[in-house]
Amino acid sequence: MTMKISKTHFLAFLLGISILITSCSDSLSDTTDGRLRHWISTLSSDEFQGRAPGTEGGKLTKNFISKTFKDLDLEPVKGSYFLEVPTSEITLKDSSYLTLSFRGDDRKMIAGKDAVFWTKQAREYRKIRDSEVVFVGYGIVAPEYNWNDYEGIDVRGKTVVILVNDPGFATGKLRLFNGKSMTYYGRWTYKFEEAARQGAAAAIVIHEEESAGYPWSVVENSWQGPQLDLQRDDLGNDRVILEGWIRDSTLNDVLNFTGFNYDALKEIALEKTFSAFSLRGLTLNSEIHNKVRYLQSHNIAAFKKGNS
């Protein structure tokens, strides 16, 4: 997560600068290629330590970009190149755990190997006890596609388990969502948001490499360690308590004890008559221990005055 945020800022800087130079004077335009190569080489070097906000590398990055703006005779916004962005950093402690239980048989998820989990709620301690696990298919409510995986079920306080992507990808049918092209309904961000709107206590997306578009290692590396987010007035209480991913192979192993079959669940989720249902006897227990830190990050912005 940290790297995702810093890469976004890094790429936005390069894109903005390249557009700006192209539209400015001939002297700048003539050196666009060389300058971009220099900036990319510099910012991607080990000296900048990953460029993460709230770190020494982040500070070096901000100073480098602001100096570059100044060297290009760009104007600061309201007297400063730095625009304040109140940020929270939540780090999951090792004492946290996630357990799936079936009729007294507990399976503790090994962080990184079996599953990853976190909370967007900026609190030092959260817990979930004996939360009923519900399979909600793709976890989508899309009136324009006449699709509602949550219709007829109350998941308040429960744990929803969700397939990644959307039904169009699984079937390849162009008239079903957008075929193989993922819609926003297929993204994990939407699935967590919808689960929160439905009042779920926890939401876990099932990772399949083909459907997700990336291997498990991406999930493992992105969601462990400090997680950055915007500071929120409600401390993130509008989110579910626990968000996470589980490997498809891990879930399949768990389901083998319950009498359910993972491949069968995927097929059922594509039926027009699909209704979400409880995975009877399967419950989730979790304790989340966080280190919460608040910091002042920055966006860096500048402009060049036009001639008219």
Regions found by a protein language model. Give the residues of each.
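Structural recognition of the beta-strand scaffold that forms the well-ordered cores
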Residues: S41-S44, V133-V136, T159-L163, A202-I206, ...
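A conserved hydrophobic secondary-structure block that centers on an alpha-helix together
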Residues: Y138-S217
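Long, well-ordered, tryptophan-enriched scaffold segments
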Residues: R197-Y214, W223, L228-N299
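Bacterial N-terminal signal peptides
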Residues: A12-T22
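Bacterial N-terminal signal peptides that target proteins for export
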Residues: T2-L11
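Noncatalytic luminal/extracellular "stalk/propeptide" segments of secretory-pathway proteins
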Residues: Q49-L174, S278, E287, S297-N299
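Acidic/His- and Gly-rich active-site-bordering loop/insert found
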Residues: L43, F69, R103, R247, ...
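N-terminal hydrophobic or amphipathic helices/low-complexity stretches enriched
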Residues: C24-P76, T87, Y97, W216, ...
